[in-house]
Amino acid sequence: VPLVDLPVEELRREVALVTQEHHVFVGTLADNLRLGKEEASDEELLAALDDVGAASWFTALKDGLETELGSGGHTLTPSQAQELALARLVLADPHTLVLDEATSLIDPQAARSVERSLGAVLSGRTVVAIAHRLHTAHDADRVAVVEDGRITELGSHDELLALDGSYAALWRSWRSE
C-alpha cells in the first residue's frame, strides 16, 4: 500500500522515527514510556527498558517507574534520553522504523549492544537506519552509500567490500584505527 494512501492515524501507528534529538516530557518515567503504548503494563515498560540496555541507570532510580522527569524532576543524561526514546519505540511496535543516528549519544560499545537487542526485539520489521558508525551498516541487509545527496553504492556489506569503492575504503580506514 503506498504511504500516501494510508490514513494519517494508521501511518503514525505503523511508521516511527527516532532521531538523535529526544524529548523527555514532564511526568513520570512510566508516563514518558507509555507515549509508546498507552495501555502498557509496568512489566512491559520494564522489559522495554531492559531491551534497550537502560537497566543500568533505571535500577538506580529511587522511585523506579514513578520517578518524576523533566522540569523540577530527575534529569536524564542525553544517552539516557536516547534509551528512553528507543524503549518507547519498542513499546510502540511499529511495522516500519526510521532510525536517524538513533544511538549516536550512547557510547559505541553500549550502542552496539543496544542495536543487537533492538535487532532481536524488532525482528521482521522494515528498518531504515541512517548511521555514521560502520558497525551499524555492517549488520544491515542492504547498505546505501550516499555522497553529495546521491546513492553511489548499494548492496550488502560483503558486496560493497568486493566493489572496492567508497564504502570499502571507509571500512578499511575504520578497521585500521
Region roles according to the model:
Residues 1, 38, 72-74:
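Well-ordered beta-strand scaffold positions
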Residues 3, 35, 103:
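Receiver (REC) domain active-site loop signature in two-component systems and cognate sites
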Residues 9-21, 29-32, 46-52, 66-164:
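ABC-family ATPase nucleotide-binding domain "signature/switch" substructure
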Residues 26:
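The conserved phosphate-sensing helix
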Residues 34-42:
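ABC-type ATPase nucleotide-binding domains, specifically the catalytic core motifs of the NBD
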Residues 39, 55-62:
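Conserved H-loop
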Residues 54, 162-177:
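C-terminal boundary and immediately downstream tail of ABC-type ATPase nucleotide-binding domains
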